[in-house]
């Protein structure tokens, strides 16, 4: 589905004091979601974990602005937004986070686009530099081929997969899972969601 452009999206985010000024300093109290979309999942995490800080990274302001309704609903003071491409994160963020989420990234299915996948080795280096020792990278996707690519890429680039499942909603970790807007759509169509956790070793 094409994202509808919202001309004043960036201004609306700024007016809510949600937009971070770069470079933004973080520590191990921070959890990052890359490609947060409308922010449903990360805002719920922020509400459930008031002693932690959450940074939603989104390339498109017209998607990120939708998170404002959740900020208001939950009265959040521990959630912030960075408008950025994932490849630029080391220039935008200083410090190390405890967890990075990749939630339903574009699988870039064509072989010639494999370097754009967010689990390609160049991106994995960025995440390794943004995570504390034993920090966790978490991935959710509905695309099995992308999931398989991600598993191999992680193994080949110094990561250890500590948990994986091809059916998140019938797994041991489902009780703590918070669905994204995109995820809810596919679950209603009985799609299986693939999930993994990994640490850099």
From Swiss-Prot:
Recorded GO CC terms: tRNA methyltransferase complex
Membrane-spanning residues: none
Name the CDD domains for this protein. Answer: AdoMet_MTases
Against SUPFAM superfamilies, the record matches this protein to:
S-adenosyl-L-methionine-dependent methyltransferases (SSF53335)
Q: Where is the active site?
A: 106
Annotated metabolic or biological route of this protein = tRNA modification; N(7)-methylguanine-tRNA biosynthesis
Q: Indicate which residues the UniProt annotation says bind substrate.
A: 110, 142, 180-183
Q: Which reaction does it catalyse?
A: guanosine(46) in tRNA + S-adenosyl-L-methionine = N(7)-methylguanosine(46) in tRNA + S-adenosyl-L-homocysteine
Single GO molecular function: tRNA (guanine(46)-N7)-methyltransferase activity
Alphabetic keyword roster: Methyltransferase, S-adenosyl-L-methionine, Transferase, tRNA processing
**Annotated EC:** 2.1.1.33
Q: Which InterPro entries match?
A: SAM-dependent_MTases_sf, tRNA_(Gua-N-7)_MeTrfase_Trmb, tRNA_methyltr_TrmB_bact
Q: Where does S-adenosyl-L-methionine bind?
A: 33, 58, 85, 106
Record-linked Pfam families: Methyltransf_4 (PF02390)
Q: Which PANTHER family match?
A: 3-DEOXY-D-MANNO-OCTULOSONIC-ACID TRANSFERASE/TRNA GUANINE-N 7 - -METHYLTRANSFERASE, PENTACOTRIPEPTIDE-REPEAT REGION OF PRORP DOMAIN-CONTAINING PROTEIN
What family, per the record? Belongs to the class I-like SAM-binding methyltransferase superfamily. TrmB family.
Function text: Catalyzes the formation of N(7)-methylguanine at position 46 (m7G46) in tRNA.
UniProt name for this protein: tRNA (guanine-N(7)-)-methyltransferase
Organism the protein comes from: Mesomycoplasma hyopneumoniae (strain 232)
């Amino acid at each position: 589905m094409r994202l509808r452009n919202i001309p004043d999206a960036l201004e609306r985010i700024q007016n809510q004091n949600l937009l971070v000024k770069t470079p933004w300093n973080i520590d191990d109290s921070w959890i990052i979601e890359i490609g947060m979309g409308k922010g449903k999942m990360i805002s719920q995490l922020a509400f459930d974990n008031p002693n932690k800080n959450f940074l939603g990274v989104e390339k498109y302001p017209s998607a990120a602005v939708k998170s404002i309704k959740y900020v208001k609903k939950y009265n959040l003071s521990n959630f912030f937004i960075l408008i950025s491409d994932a490849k630029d994160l080391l220039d935008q963020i200083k410090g190390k986070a405890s967890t990075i989420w990749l939630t339903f990234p574009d699988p870039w299915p064509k072989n010639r686009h494999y370097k754009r996948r967010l689990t390609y080795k160049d991106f994995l280096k960025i995440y390794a530099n943004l995570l504390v020792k034993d920090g966790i990278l978490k991935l959710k996707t509905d695309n099995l081929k992308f999931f398989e690519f991600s598993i191999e890429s992680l193994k080949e680039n110094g990561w250890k997969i500590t948990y994986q499942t091809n059916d998140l909603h019938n797994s041991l970790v489902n009780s703590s899972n918070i669905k994204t807007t995109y995820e809810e759509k596919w679950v209603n169509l009985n799609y299986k969601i693939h999930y993994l956790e990994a640490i850099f070793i």
